[in-house]
Each structure stands twice: as structure tokens, then as C-alpha cells.
UniProtKB/Swiss-Prot annotation:
Protein name stated in the entry: Methionyl-tRNA formyltransferase
Annotated residues for binding of (6S)-5,6,7,8-tetrahydrofolate: S106, L107, L108, P109
Zinc-finger recorded as keyword: no
Pfam families attached to this UniProt entry: Formyl_trans_C, Formyl_trans_N
CDD domains named among the record's database cross-references: FMT_core_Met-tRNA-FMT_N, Met_tRNA_FMT_C
Cellular component annotations (GO), alphabetically ordered: cytosol
Source organism (scientific name): Thermosipho melanesiensis (strain DSM 12029 / CIP 104789 / BI429)
Alphabetized GO MF terms: methionyl-tRNA formyltransferase activity
Coiled coil: none
Family designation: Belongs to the Fmt family.
Gene this chain is encoded by: fmt
EC number in record: 2.1.2.9
Main function: Attaches a formyl group to the free amino group of methionyl-tRNA(fMet). The formyl group appears to play a dual role in the initiator identity of N-formylmethionyl-tRNA by promoting its recognition by IF2 and preventing the misappropriation of this tRNA by the elongation apparatus.
Catalytic activity field: L-methionyl-tRNA(fMet) + (6R)-10-formyltetrahydrofolate = N-formyl-L-methionyl-tRNA(fMet) + (6S)-5,6,7,8-tetrahydrofolate + H(+)
Length: 303
């Protein structure tokens, strides 16, 4: 089976490498154009491109997929297209040239869109998974070939769930390809969406419900980290690991700090958080920050 692989970030590159290690014939890779990264704004290859070059797979990075993509398919004649976090919607006529299947990090039709892992955590879902579906003209609405479920822990972070779904996704992709063609099932159930993350999403408000605060912190841990004001400066918080109900203290107040973390009051309770990061400094425990005279009990985060 001749595979055309479309993907861009790390999540996609792991899937591509797993295909190669399992002996699949990837005839070409299409990835987004290279972009400047880091403080020096140096142009760096996408993670998928790096893997493709490692295995001597032809790489294409068209700005307009419909124009250049048609030539790629005409010349290489792939049997199937696999899409993992490519970064753009596929549209006709390119979409109609062969069957394209997408590996999506949610249980469709729930959480269609760009940020399913973060939105699952924000909403406190107890289960999520991987869906492999045939791409249609709508956003993540095509018929399903394969679904795999996993449980989501109460304090599981974005980083932890990302790794879990990454492992599940690459194995599901191999299973799908080994059994292709698979009978497709239309998507059924309640549709929900997972829009792209904005700066507003990263703002933490301790005046909200304690469960909301807990889920907000873990949804962006370890990257990019939720933001909250402390003494008129933006700090980041990570590592929420406990909640207490029915606190009646001042909102955003640091009730206590010990070696485990800081207990911070919310609307109807308090959360225990392990790490804080001040501007221009490394991430540190609250206990380290207290010993360094950067923070103390009784002080408050701005809401």
C-alpha cells in the first residue's frame, strides 16, 4: 500500500516514524512550510519534515495544496492519504483524488476542531480517545473507521494525556492500515467543538468554581501554562493535585505553603498547586518561591 502522509507537528511526526518502523511504504510527505522559531527566529523544519528526511522520504511543503498537491498525487500515485495534524482543511479537487483518513484526538463527534485534548480537560471529561475517520468536506465530520477509548484521570495534565493519546493513536493507525479497507460508520451523537486556543483561554480566575480552576490549570500543564496576576505581574501555575470543598476565605488568597505546594482559595473551595513560574525565571515549587522571599502566605492572586 502506497501511503501519502500529511502532517506537521510533533504529534504527527511520531505517527510517521511509527509507520516507517513498522515497514509501511510512505511514498511522500506533505507538511506545512517551515517557519521561524525561538528567540533567534531561525527557520527550522517541521517535526514531520525532520522524520521524512531521516528516512529519505520526498517532502513537499506547498502553500496551496490544491495546485501543487494534485501534481504530487498524479506523479506518485498513492493508494491512500493519512492525515495527522496537518494544519489545514483538505478541499476539492485535491480531496477527491483519493481516500484520506484522519487521526483525531477525541471521540468524534465530540470535540471536533484544533484543540481536543485541552478542551476535554477543561470540561472535566472522564473519557476520551482516538478516532480515525474518512475526511469529507466538513470539519472532522466524516464516517468513522476506528475508535479507541481511554480514561482521563481527575488530575491528569495535558502533557500526560497527550502522551497517552499519542501512543494510542500510532497503534490505532497501524491497526487501521493492517485491516484496510474497513467498514465505515456515520458519526452519531451530540456534536461539540474544540476551537483553537487563544490568549484569553490561558487566563486563570480564582473567583470561579474550584472544579473549573482545577481543570483550567491541568488543561495547559506543562505547556503553555495558565496565567494569573500576582503583584501586577503575570505568573504561571502548574501541578494542581488536590481540591478542598466549601472554603469561605478571600478569593485567590494563599492560605498555606508547604513542601507539597500552595493551598489557594477559590469560589467554593480551594486548590493545592505545586509549581509557580515568575517572569524571566524557571518553574519552581511554591516552597522554593517562599524560601526565596518571592511569595508568602496571606498574599493574594488578582482575579
Amino acid at each position: 500500500m502506497r501511503i501519502l502522509f500529511l502532517g506537521t507537528p510533533d504529534f504527527a511526526s511520531v505517527h510517521l516514524e511509527f509507520l516507517m518502523k513498522n515497514g509501511f511504504d510512505v511514498v511522500a510527505v506533505i507538511s506545512q512550510p517551515d517557519k521561524p522559531k525561538g528567540r533567534g527566529k531561525k527557520i527550522l523544519p517541521t517535526p514531520v519534515k525532520e522524520v521524512a528526511l531521516k528516512y529519505n522520504i520526498p517532502v513537499f511543503q506547498p502553500k496551496k495544496l490544491n495546485k501543487e498537491g494534485l501534481k504530487i498525487i498524479e506523479n506518485l500515485k498513492p493508494d491512500i492519504g493519512i492525515v495527522v495534524a496537518y494544519g489545514k482543511l483538505l478541499k476539492p479537487p485535491f480531496l477527491n483524488t483519493l481516500e484520506f483518513y484522519n487521526v483525531h484526538a477525541s471521540l468524534l463527534p465530540s470535540y471536533r476542531g484544533a484543540a481536543p485534548i485541552q478542551r476535554v480537560l477543561e470540561n472535566g471529561e472522564k473519557r476520551t480517545g482516538i478516532t480515525i475517520f474518512k475526511i469529507g468536506e466538513g470539519m472532522d465530520d466524516g464516517p468513522i473507521a476506528l475508535k479507541k477509548e481511554v480514561e482521563v484521570g481527575e488530575f491528569e495534565t495535558f502533557g500526560e494525556l497527550y502522551e497517552k493519546l499519542l501512543d494510542l493513536g500510532k497503534k490505532a493507525l497501524i491497526e487501521f492500515l493492517n485491516n484496510y479497507p474497513i467498514e465505515l460508520i456515520p458519526q452519531e451523537g451530540k456534536v461539540s467543538f474544540a476551537p483553537k486556543i487563544t490568549k484569553e483561554d490561558l487566563k486563570l480566575d480564582f473567583s470561579k468554581d474550584v472544579t473549573f480552576v482545577k481543570n483550567k490549570i491541568r488543561a495547559y500543564d506543562p505547556l503553555p501554562g495558565v496565567r494569573v496576576l500576582f503583584k501586577r505581574k503575570i505568573v504561571k501555575l502548574f501541578g494542581v493535585f488536590s481540591v478542598l470543598e466549601n472554603s469561605s476565605r478571600e478569593i485567590g488568597k494563599i492560605i498555606s505553603i508547604d513542601k507539597e505546594g500552595a493551598l489557594i482559595s477559590c469560589e467554593n473551595g480551594s486548590v493545592k498547586v505545586r509549581y509557580i513560574q515568575f517572569p524571566g525565571k524557571r518553574k519552581m515549587t511554591f516552597f522554593e518561591a517562599k524560601n526565596g522571599c518571592l511569595i508568602k502566605e496571606g498574599e493574594c492572586f488578582d482575579c
